[in-house]
Amino acid sequence: MKTQRDGHSLGWWSLVLLLLGLVMPLAIIAQVLSYKEAVLRAIDGINQRSSDANLYRLLDLDPRPTMDGDPDTPKPVSFTVKETVCPRTTQQSPEDCDFKKDGLVKRCMGTVTLNQARGSFDISCDKDNKRFALLGDFFRKAKEKIGKESKRIVQRIKDFLRNLVPRTES
């Protein structure tokens, strides 16, 4: 014979199981890192392995490529880091450090996983080639000069055409 107490007990256990069913997916979702969080973790790893005197901080993150939803699948990343004023031996977060004036800039590429529990990364960083930076400055300045010159040339052509039109005397 079933008692009223058994009915309450069954209802209570049903409620507990229902709540567990709702909470477990949230716990799984909470373990997935965002693209930027995964990159910041990779930078922490780069700083730990670095033999340089100062920490590096994220300078520029390339747009996130289209990815599948599996957090365990390695995702391609590329970003740029720059040397900060904080010594590597500090316990300070690189995000709290100012960039060092004329600090070393490194271009990093590789893969990260978004699974927080088993997060991993395979990143390699190379110094940004100063020649390419200088070449970029050259092209930027050339573009500015060409822009100014083209305006001047257009104005000269307009003036020339205005002088070609016969003037009528009134």
Curated annotation (Swiss-Prot):
Cysteine-cysteine disulfides: 86-97, 108-125
GO cellular component, one term: vesicle
GO molecular function, one term: lipopolysaccharide binding
Record propeptide residues: 31-131
Signal peptide: 1-30
Post-translational modification: Proteolytically cleaved by proteinase PRTN3 into antibacterial peptide LL-37. Proteolytically cleaved by cathepsin CTSG and neutrophil elastase ELANE. After secretion onto the skin surface, the CAMP gene product is processed by a serine protease-dependent mechanism into multiple novel antimicrobial peptides distinct from and shorter than cathelicidin LL-37. These peptides show enhanced antimicrobial action, acquiring the ability to kill skin pathogens such as S.aureus, E.coli and C.albicans. These peptides have lost the ability to stimulate CXCL8/IL8 release from keratinocytes. The peptides act synergistically, killing bacteria at lower concentrations when present together, and maintain activity at increased salt condition.
Domain of life of the organism encoding this protein: Eukaryota
One GO term of the biological process aspect: defense response to Gram-positive bacterium
Main localisation: secreted
Record has Ligase as a keyword: no
A Pfam family matched in the record: CAP18_C
Keywords: Antibiotic, Antimicrobial, Cleavage on pair of basic residues, Disulfide bond, Immunity, Innate immunity, Secreted, Signal
InterPro entries in UniProt: Cathelicidin-like (IPR001894), Cathelicidin_CS (IPR018216), Cathlecidin_C (IPR022746), Cystatin_sf (IPR046350)
UniProt subcellular location: Secreted; Vesicle
Region (Active core) residue spans: 150-162
Job description of the protein: Antimicrobial protein that is an integral component of the innate immune system. Binds to bacterial lipopolysaccharides (LPS). Acts via neutrophil N-formyl peptide receptors to enhance the release of CXCL2. Postsecretory processing generates multiple cathelicidin antimicrobial peptides with various lengths which act as a topical antimicrobial defense in sweat on skin. The unprocessed precursor form, cathelicidin antimicrobial peptide, inhibits the growth of Gram-negative E.coli and E.aerogenes with efficiencies comparable to that of the mature peptide LL-37 (in vitro).
Family membership: Belongs to the cathelicidin family.
Domain observations: The cathelin-like domain (CLD), which is the propeptide part, does not seem to exhibit auto-inhibitory function, as it does not inhibit the antibacterial activity of antibacterial peptide LL-37.
Protein name: Cathelicidin antimicrobial peptide
Native source species: Gorilla gorilla gorilla (Western lowland gorilla)
